[in-house]
Amino acid sequence: MTGKTGKKNYLDFGVLDKQEIVFSQLLKKNGYKTLIAGKWQLGKEKNLPYHFGFDEHILWQHKLSRTDSLGHDTRYPNPVLEVNGENKKFKNGSFGPNLIVDYINDFVNKNKDEKFLVYYPMLLTHCPFVPTPDSDDFDPEDNGSKIYRGNAKYFGDMVSYMDKMVGRIFDNLKKQNLLKNTLIIFTSDNGNDAPIVSLNSEGEVLWGKGQTTDNGTHVPLI
């Protein structure tokens, strides 16, 4: 967000220095409507999303921890998300990524005649690896995994669902006739986490998150 490597401005895990200038502040200063939607993990102070230039936010892990009082991860099935400063528990089989993309598309629709920024640090495909609403064994009564990594067999389902969520955003931009005038950047912050093994045209790609290896540092940029 700052254009700097972590070596130059790292304070602590999950902390973004308030003295830093980030791209959302620059765009807001130049008349853009701004939204951050997804994972926060940049500090727990109440006003931080606004401080860093976001008019609106729908976030996981801002003021609250990643688990509830019973140890359930709170980002995927029936999640707890912060919507513009208010923590909300969603029920009835809702799924965090769906709710976030709903908000993104609503934000785009109401600002389609303005300059806008959507920063979408998506929840998917981070562990815990869990069923999605498209999985055969998705449980609408589930309140989240108690196991940090979940079950790696669901990683493929989560990748497919990520693709579906990106597709929903593209489809909405197309519907609003905004695709030709919208810059979309798709990237990541690290390689796969253990124990995930992916495939490409050359064969298997082992996990590497947290390692200073190609598998840990090479990410998509589209």
Predicted regions: what they are:
Residues 1-222:
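Formylglycine-dependent sulfatase
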